[in-house]
Amino acid sequence: MKLHDLRPAKDAKKKRKRVGRGTGSGRGFTSGRGSKGQNARSGGGVRPTFEGGQTPLFRKLPKKGFNNIFKKVYNEVNVYQLNKFNKGEEVTPEKLLEKGIIDKVARSGVKILGNGELDKALTVKAHAFTKSAREKIEAAGGKAEVI
């Protein structure tokens, strides 16, 4: 079999429905829109939340909560993820970004969490550390510095 022998499966390619091309086509005159009314007009139809004049569900439900602008949002990195670095290397948010451990530096920066084990001495510079993460970094012979 060669590339020029390849054909799509039967009925795999559906033809586009061309409407409004004469009554003989079967899709002429009203073009499948029915006769008159809001939905027959161009730009017609109702918005997704419209329920025919009945009070919509989103207005019946109470407002709840708020977004705290002072909330601290960190990128969370576990201790075991730092094993990707070489012994004695300095770990910064920029280097975590380079290695693909984080996607982007969050609003409040990077926080190191204590899940897993660290088997290398590293100098870790981050915006926050959990108590267990700091202990594990120092137990491996490294340093945990808050930036």
Curated annotation (Swiss-Prot):
* Record-linked InterPro entries: Ribosomal_uL15, Ribosomal_uL15/eL18, Ribosomal_uL15/eL18_sf, Ribosomal_uL15_bac-type, Ribosomal_uL15_CS
Which residues fall in a compositionally biased region of kind Gly residues?
A: 21-35
Keyword annotations of the record: Ribonucleoprotein, Ribosomal protein, RNA-binding, rRNA-binding
Q: Which GO terms describe its molecular function?
A: rRNA binding; structural constituent of ribosome
Concerning its family, UniProt says: Belongs to the universal ribosomal protein uL15 family.
The family database entries (HAMAP family) matched by this protein are listed as: Ribosomal_uL15
Q: How does it assemble?
A: Part of the 50S ribosomal subunit.
PANTHER family in alphabetical order: 50S RIBOSOMAL PROTEIN L15, LARGE RIBOSOMAL SUBUNIT PROTEIN UL15M
Q: This protein is called what? A: Large ribosomal subunit protein uL15
Q: Which organism is it from?
A: Halothermothrix orenii (strain H 168 / OCM 544 / DSM 9562)
